């Protein structure tokens, strides 16, 4: 009885065991299959990180078009406006002229003494320029839009027109056409600002009649009292857009600004040392038959800085000549100063940005030389690009993307800094604050030296100093103020190259004090002779008693 009943029991256990094994195998198969499918899908995502919903071309300026293909990057681009786009006069950043009143004396005679404010994100770059009092109280050049707008379609149109070639929308959309863009850039650089702005609003942007992602600025300023004749809408004009840095067909990073193309060709043709630019060194060792072209020769890592260097640079931007990057002698502050010193305008007059409103000195105005100062710093020497810090990589699913919310690295320390610096966030913040604090303190000392220099020059003029006597003093003033302005206008507060910033400010102080001393000598009466004053010979050992003459 027992033997007969145990046989079915063993058989049942075998069936259950077999079923369990089949179940485990099935589950394991499903898990492995799911993992393999997930890996395959992630690999496919990494190979094809976007789905092309709309076709783009060379007139697809409106970034909302690109956002349909790359929604993640577009959403981050919109974040450059902050949580909400703040327009209107009450929303403008605080005036630097109120923060640092001595700037009014630094810029006396120049439009920046009228209105000069803290910079905001890329979303505001066109808005804030259109409403600044600088463009309403003083006539500015169309060259300003080279960097404050997305102007390449306009440049191409003007170039094709000047070259006698078709310039309809089909021709504009077909090809970037750098020769036409360069020609249009030359044609429009010296034209009045509002004339070029109005032309920009008539260019196709891929979404005719539709408003852009950000509100349009009031073209006549906030009161509209100074609105130019034929007041126009701003719908088709955009701040920097996707098309300014990317090829719409391949998405490759590219250079679109004519000023940078010419500036890099001039830099490469010279012999000045450069950091983080291996393609320039390779070109210099070659046959040099064609000018250096970053779009053909630069590495991807170089391009991650070059696209920023299209605008975050020093340049001439006014009505006397075509916009120009002063890089023929190099990227150091004194290299650019030498370039401006040697330059003459087309009419033969020596180059200047403005003549100082108090002293009449011929001065150069620095713009925002972040690219040049960065090139002198340790990060550039280490091969760290602008985008590595300001647009750091991040993981989104299987994709590795650059963060398109372009901003200070201090707002994204984990991705921007701690991928290289294995220290705490608080320590990194303290390092930056220390560097910037020292630079600001030195800047204030340079500003104090500048104001005392200006006072001394004015007193010398009041005392009857001649033009011949003042000429070398005004040359020192120019050197002092160029150096101070260089660091004031650069937006990192010295962080991009701390030692270089300190050197430049130290030279500014030195030149200011030299000019002040010479001016005081012109103002003061002749100094009495010092030959009869008691004097103790220099000794190698400190004497134990006071000299007889000083008892």
Range-by-range predicted roles:
Residues 1-15:
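N-terminal Lys/Arg-rich, disordered targeting/topogenic segments
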Residues 118-127:
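Intrinsically disordered, low-complexity acidic and serine/threonine/proline-rich regulatory regions
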Residues 137-155, 159-161, 168-170:
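A cross-kingdom signal targeting lumenal/periplasmic-facing segments of multi-pass membrane
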Residues 527-540:
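Mature N-terminal, pre-catalytic/accessory segment of carbohydrate-active enzymes
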